[in-house]
Every structure is written in structure tokens, then in C-alpha cells.
Amino acid sequence: MTEAKTGTGNERLVVEIVGAHNLMPKDGEDSSSPFVEVQFENQRLRTKVKPKDLNPIWNEKLVFHVIDVNDLRHKALEINVYNEKRSSNSRNFLGKVRVLGSSVGREGESVVQLYTLEKRSLFSSVRGEISVKHYMTTTAENGENVRRVNRSGGSKKSKKVQNVSSSMAIQQQQQQQQQQISLHNHNRGNQQQSQQNGQGQRMLPFYPHQSEIKPLVITALPSPMPGPGPRPIVYSNGSSEFSLKETKPCLGGTSNGLGGLSSHKDKTSSTYDLVEQMQYLYVNIVKAKDLSVLGEVVSEVKLGNYRGVTKKVSSNSSNPEWNQVFVFSKERIQSSVVELFVKEGNKDEYTGRVLFDLSEIPTRVPPDSPLAPQWYKIENRNGGRGNGELMVSVWFGTQADEAFAEAWHSKAGNVHIEELSSIKSKVYLSPKLWYLRISVIEAQDVAIMDKGSSLMRFPELSAKLQVGSQILRTAIASAIPTKSFSNPYWNEDLMFVVAEPFEDCVTVVVEDRLNGGAIGGQNDVAVGRVQIPISAVERRTGDTLVGSRWFSLDNGNNNNRFGSRIHLRLSLDGGYHVLDEATMYNSDVRPTAKELWKPQVGLLEIGILSATGLMPMKVRDGKCGGIADSYCVAKYGPKWVRTRTVVDSLCPKWNEQYTWEVYDPCTVVTVGVFDNARVNENNNSRDVRIGKVRIRLSTLETGRVYTHSYPLIVLHPSGVKKTGELHLAVRLSCGNAVNMLHMYALPLLPKMHYTQPLGVHMLERLRYQTLNAVAARLSRAEPPLGREVVEYMLDHDFHVWSMRRSKANFFRLVNVISGLVAVAKLVEVMRSWSKPVYSTVFVLAFLFMVLFPELLLPCLLLYTAAVGVWRFRRRSRYPPHMDARISHAETVFPDELDEEFDTFPTSRGFDVVRMRYDRVRSIAGRVQTVVGDMASQGERVQALLSWRDPRATFLFLMFCLLAAVGFYTVPVKLTVAISGLYYLRPPRFRRKLPSRGLSFFRRLPSRADSLL
């Protein structure tokens, strides 16, 4: 430990430099010799040098004296990482971190925090992260590990810090090895000894492999003393209740059983490095043999107050098999033994049992092979040897264990055994969807229905097509002179959405409408039909037309006099992307045909950590206050994930990590939180939405771990409500930077959307059919993903009229135009000459651009680039989130909310509907006026040459002729300069009346006087 002595205060600031990861090589040999230099006020301390190490571990404490603790929040720590160049006695910059003094906590409350190294200047080459712990203390640090450095001896200080004795290095290595050995030798004696020594927190070293690109995360062991541990530090992005907050959770790799990180990092731990470690006790009951039981046999696991029971097995065999896994949270274990009972049927008395001491249970760390079950002798009620044996395996593990997903959890002990499947975590896949294009061209020799009438009747023939529940109709065939009435001609394209596997058929029915009426009414009579299996339809990936075919029509009356047939062209279009989400929230834009997919450009990893402050959703007997049975659903591309349901908790912890392949960075991932209504309730109940979060991947930096608390905001008829906060850890990894940058130059949608575009109304109808297909498929899964969940995740109602959304979009447009308005105001300020110096500089710049017009575009582009570089340092470090202020959810009126939640068609009373109709009329009237004014200005431009006003057109033509002569004789530069100077002339040379040109334009006629 290094200490800087400045002053006589007792308060000390301790900065513990733990380690760094993935540093930039600077020595020319793909390595670096890093050290850390920390500066606080006028005190500067540094760690020892780690030669040839891009992932150094220091575990050194630097102590700074604080004169005024109250002034600490106005100061900052400067942490710089350098590479030591021994040959030239100089150093290279590797990165820096600036820590505000307001974020420094007290001793015992701080945790190790991971900081991303920042650049010192624009051209600095920096990468990597550094793990630092900082806190205030009043305890004097004494011992042989403390090195005191005087501020006055600058050169001596450097020599003392750099020249670390070899005995000290060997001693630190021995201490690190002892810590690693103590991690693997987990027993109670070590815990009791740590309690006697009064250790609050111990830092464990972590040695990652240099080839891995995962961020270094070092966590602190929880205090062995009773009581809750330190909470993660939270940094708010604003004072609003609906703001985004940055968190610092203890993320890590494989746990060693003591709550820390092991010194190695394996494949499984790297796949769970975005979640917090959760320790569990696993009990796997496989089977039994040689039991002397007459009735049905069950096995029971008892751990303190927790009790889990297996399914009943028939007594036909003396060797029953269960193959069930029970999981108990280690943080809630209140017993020293776990008991396994074998019972007969529903009897309370057991026939035998097996006991395990928790201190002797091993710890399994993936990717170790599963623990092999063993046979254990069953004890009778008297403690003697009973009849039979029980095959079980018991071990400690984490949520990374393979048995975790399908196991019975102790927190779900109150859930009925038949409902356990509805609370498990699952991964779903959306069905592979295709657009089915059917071109109804024509029909021949259709049997026309005359209904016994002697009068000549013109048939009204149309075609009805049905695929599953989707029904579309063509228009009534129009009369063509070259074709008879029995040969109708339509030539219409109809689109359907179908899902693999193709089990449905296309039913084509030719109908004749009798006695008038609407199409599809009771007067339509089928005159022929044909069924075509979808599996026989030809697939296409481009815009090349497939061949058309003739199909025979069955008229149903065995009348062979007419050989009716219909001409169709059917194709499964794989070149389109079947839209199931709103265009602005697309999570996948790939076409259906796999051969058209672009290569993968990255990997998206999301750690769903926990939720806090959830709103109670139900009241359950025996529970004080409301509770919630919450789970999360994340959707990106065709992959849906569902976390397990945490029962009876308003602050659930999931700590589940999922991965998606990224094919386009300009996509959005959606994470929703729901209350499981199927837990101890009616299975037909609908899950209640709690809130959701959208994250656009293009706003994320590659390789950076984003740990934030996202507000869950739901709009109710009574107003906007915050229903809780969702804690996520998100990382976007880039496999090939060139491919990712190349994606920005490609069209957003596949080629077919531009060569053969679909109409807006058709896309909306197809999107609704796609939603039905996805919801129907996911609702048949186990556990089912309800339709209400699918609709909420896919934003099925984003197109519904809302006064609130209209205001939000209007002010978004105003915000976009505000830049142009600001430029116009700036020019007006220059014209007003209220600031003569600025106006003079502006005029000189204008004349410079007139004299050298070839510099105009380069200067403009250079200025744009400079603005972008200047804004880089002030860029937002937080990903965008749902903003209640931008959505105008905080200032919306109650009646506008009630209108937004109204059904379609409306279900409100007459007076309410009339009031809303009058309000819409008032708004539409103002819009109508603005549109009319814009049309009038355009019509005045057209009137310049229309001779509607002969005198105005004559004057305009004379002006054009004179202007042509003037522009031909006078140089362009001189013309532009004179025009600009005339426009920028001081106010004393201007008059307040409108210009003659503007007055002339306003006198031109428009078509407004022709309106009724």
C-alpha cells in the first residue's frame, strides 16, 4: 500500500487498483508494461510496473489524505494508465478514467467498479477496461505492506515506487496463491476464521486469458457478518422519476462456492459473464430399488422449511424411477443437512431416508461433467439400515448448470405441480413465414346461374380465395368485348401469409352474385371451386415470374357439359421480409429465403438481471399486501426468450443471459416484463403487462457492457405510471467491423421490397395476418406464450389514432426544424447589425466565399466534420430509452387518454363521441387552413406564366428579359456580391415596408376564389 502524506487530517481516500483488461499493445512486440498513476489534488501516486502483460493484476492500495471531506464532492480522481519504456526512460499513454468525488462511498459500502478507459485526445489509441475500488476511511494503515511517500521528494518517490523489492513481489505472489487455494478448499473453518479476523470484504485476483475479449469483472466477497451486503452503486441520468440510471452490478464468471470468482475463466463462465452469480443446492433423485412398499411411491426432499415432492410412481415395480431435480437457493438455506425421504402414497410417515451434510457436498463448476448419481443405503425410522437403496446426486452449483432450467425451484414451492411448466424459462422460435402470391388471371367456361329466369342476366363473377382463416376476394370481372360472359377476366394479385410446415390448402371459389347486393353476401353462389396444397406451390427468390397454370373447377353437380377451369399463377415469394413488427421497431430485416441472407456482423448478449419496485398486480391469500409473479420476455429476430417466473416477489432476480446473432446493426431488441396470471389461477387468464424496454443496437458501442436500470412505463387510462425498473446488462460484439460498416450502405429491406413494392395498406393487412400466425404458433408451445404477450411485444396498436401521439410527433417535427429556424435567426441578427463586429465578420466571410466559390463546399463539409468531432466528447453515454416527456405522457389530458384506450368502433356514449368529434373538427380546420395557404403559394407560382393575370404575367416576362441581359453582361460573382450586400445592408438603409418583389408575389391570383 502506498500513502501520500499531506496534512494532518484523519480522513483518507483509499484507491484500490485491482486490475485491467485488454490493454492496447505499445512496445512493438504486441504487449505492454503497464502501470497506473493516480492523481488527487496535488498528490500523485503510482503502482508497480507489470512487464509484458495486457491483462495486469495489481491489487494495490493507494492512500491519499483528504483535508476537507465536505469539499470532496467538488474534486475528482485522475486515473491514468501508462506503458513504461525502459529503453528510453519514457512512457506511452494507455488510457484514463476520471472519477468524481461525489461517487466515493464509505468503507464497507463500496464495491469494485469496472471503468472503460477513455482517450486523452482525438488521436489517442485506447482500448480496455480497468477495475478500481475507492472509499473513504479513518483507519490508519500500518504494517510492512504500507509504503509512505513524501510529496516533497518527487524523484525519490518515483524511485521508491518503481523499485519494488523482490521479496515483496514473492510475498504477494504467495498471498495470491493462498487465496486461490482457499477458494477451492471451501469449508466452514475458513469462514469462521474470516469472521474472527473481522474481514468485511476480501478482493480475489482474477486471471483471464489474453485471447479472450470479455471484459474483466472483479467482484468482492460478501461480508461473513450477518446482514445485507452492499448494494450496487447507481448513477442517475437525470432527476426525473422516469430517467435512465447506470448501475454497477457485480457481474462475473464462474463462482467458486464462496461467492467470489475463481482464478480461471472457462467457456461456460464466459457465457454467463453478464449476470450475477446465484448459488444453488441441486438434488437429483434418479430412482430407487429393493423397496418394500405396497402402494404408490413418492420421494421427498426437505431442507429446513423447504419441501419438494416428486411425482407418484405406481407400485407395480419395486424399482421406481423419478429423474427429478430440485433446486434450493443457497442464500435462504437455514439448515445444515438435507434429508431425502421415501414415502408410501399419501402417508405422512416415511419408510426410509437418506441424509447429507451440507459441509460435505461438493461444488460443480461447468464445464465439468455432470456429477454421477450414486446408490445410498436407506435408513429406517430408528436410524438402522432399512430396505432398499436410493440413487441420488447432490451438489452446489450456479444458474449456469444444465439442470437449472428444468428443475423444481424452492421459491416455487406454493405452485401446484400441474402449473410448474408455466413458470419455467424457455426459448421460442417464430415460425418461418412466407408471402404467398396468387395471381387470379381469368376463368373459362364458367357455368352461369340463371335461377330459372327467362330474362337475360349479366353475370357478376368474382373469385374468393381462402388460406386458413385468411379470406380475400377479387373485384367483379368487368365486361370485355373480346370475351364472353362465361370467360371472366380479373388479372389481380392477392397476397397471403403462410407458415412452415405448409399444412393448409388454397381454396379458390368462383362466385356469381345474384340479385345485387354486396360482394361476399348471402346472394353469392359458388359456381366452381378448386383446392391447391401450399406445399406444391413453386418458390422464388427474385422478381422473375413463375409459370402460370390452368386448374379445373369443380361445380359440385357432376355436370360434365362445362369444362370450367381457372388460370392462376402461384408462388411463394422468399425475397421479401415478412414484417411482423412496426417498421421503426424492426428486429430483423432478412428475407425469408436463407440463400439471400447476408453474413453475420455481430453478436448481441443480454443479461436480464433483476427488477425493482414492481407494482403489485394481484392479492393472494396469506400474503400481506399485493404481490406479482413476474417474468421477462425478450424478442430479437425470430428468437423469443422467456425467463422463469419469480413467484411472490416485487423485486425479482432472474440473472439469465441470452445471445442473439446480429445481421444488421440498425435493428431494435425489445424486452418486456409481464405478470404470470396462470400461477394458481385460471389457465384462461391473460398475463398482465408491466412494461417494456426497447434498445436500438446502432446506438451501442461494440465491446462495451451497458449496465443500466430502465424505467418500466405503462400508460393507463388514469395516466402514465412507473411500474418498476428493469436491470439489464447489454453487450454488442462485432465480429467483422468492415461488414458492419458496409451494412450502412445497403438498403434496409431486401431487394424485392423495391423491385416489386407492396402497398402501405397491403403491408398493414399482411402484418396483422403475420401477428395472428406468430401468436397462434407460440400459444401452442409449452409453456404457452399468450397472444396478449405477442401483441404487446410486436406493438400491434401503434397505428391507432391518439391525440397524445399526434402532439408528440408534431413537436418532434418542430425539434427537427429548429435547426433551420436557428440559422434563419442568426442571419437576421447579422442583418440587424445589433452586434457590429459579428456582422462585419459575417460580411467579410460572405465576400470571401463569393471571391472563392470553389472553397464553399469544402469549408461547409469541414465545418460539419468539426462540429461532429467537437460533439464527440459530449456524446451521450447512455442508450436511448422510452421517454415519458418526449411521448407527452406526463401532460396528457384525461379525456385524450380515454380516447386513446377506446375500442374501434367506439364504445363511448353519444355526448362523449360528439365532443371528441367536435375537437377533431377543430384541429382538422386548422390543418385545412395551413394546407390551403400552402396550396395558394404554389398556385401563385404557377400563375406567373399562366396569363390568368395578364398584367402580372407581362411584368414578370419583362423582368425575366431584363434579368437575362443583366446576368449575361454582369459577372456572376459581382451579381451575387451586390445582392448579398444589399440584403445585409444596415437597418438605416432599409424601410419597414415589404419589398416590391414580395408585394408583387402576394398580388398574384390563386384558385382559392374558385372554391365553394
Curated annotation (Swiss-Prot):
It is found in: Endoplasmic reticulum membrane. Highly expressed in roots meristems, shoot apical meristems (SAMs) and in incipient leaf primordia. Observed in flowers. Residues 148-160 have a biased composition (Basic residues). Residues 1-115, 262-376, 411-551, 585-710 form the C2 domain. Signal peptide: none annotated. GO terms for cellular component: endoplasmic reticulum membrane. It is a multi-pass membrane protein. Residues 141-203 are annotated as: Disordered. Pfam families: C2 (PF00168), PRT_C (PF08372). Its cofactor is Ca(2+). Ca(2+) 2 binds at E344, N346, E349. Residues 161-180, 188-202 have a biased composition (Low complexity). Ca(2+) 1 binds at E296, E344, N346. GO terms for molecular function: metal ion binding. The keyword Membrane applies. SUPFAM superfamilies: C2 domain (Calcium/lipid-binding domain, CaLB). Keywords: Calcium, Endoplasmic reticulum, Membrane, Metal-binding, Repeat, Transmembrane, Transmembrane helix. Its main location: endoplasmic reticulum. The chain crosses the membrane at residues 810-830, 841-861, 952-972. May function as a signaling molecule by regulating the trafficking of other regulators. Belongs to the MCTP family. This is Multiple C2 domain and transmembrane region protein 10.
